[in-house]
Amino acid sequence: MIQQESRLRVADNTGAKEILTIRVLGGSGRRYAGIGDVIVATVKDAIPGGNVKKGDVVKAVIVRTVKERRRPDGSYIRFDENAAVILKNDGDPRGTRIFGPVGRELREKKFMKIISLAPEVL
């Protein structure tokens, strides 16, 4: 459950290490975001020479959350950290590599490029 001011790790090679959520997209009253939801965020920590710099405002999709999520078959999935992948304006990932596992919910939300780049889909 990601909300405004939540900090997330960045799970790609764009150069950002940490982002802070500005807004959860998907309606005016939307408060929380889960795996597969898109957020607007600002880069809080970045490595020098990366594609994004500290202070940049970016769109990102959430790929891992600590809060468990119930699946249709009754099972639950949760991760050890909150993480996101930075997106371009057309919805494709800005980086060329994804680090760590991602949730299967991304497939239902049509983020196929992230699914194909990820080392593991849980």
UniProtKB/Swiss-Prot annotation:
GO terms for molecular function: large ribosomal subunit rRNA binding; structural constituent of ribosome. Binds to 23S rRNA. Forms part of two intersubunit bridges in the 70S ribosome. InterPro entries: Ribosomal_uL14, Ribosomal_uL14_bac-type, Ribosomal_uL14_CS, Ribosomal_uL14_sf. PROSITE patterns: RIBOSOMAL_L14 (PS00049). This is Large ribosomal subunit protein uL14. Belongs to the universal ribosomal protein uL14 family. The gene is rplN. PANTHER family: 50S/60S RIBOSOMAL PROTEIN L14/L23, LARGE RIBOSOMAL SUBUNIT PROTEIN UL14M. The keyword Cell division does not apply. The keyword Ribosomal protein applies. Part of the 50S ribosomal subunit. Forms a cluster with proteins L3 and L19. In the 70S ribosome, L14 and L19 interact and together make contacts with the 16S rRNA in bridges B5 and B8. It comes from Streptomyces coelicolor (strain ATCC BAA-471 / A3(2) / M145). Keywords: Ribonucleoprotein, Ribosomal protein, RNA-binding, rRNA-binding.
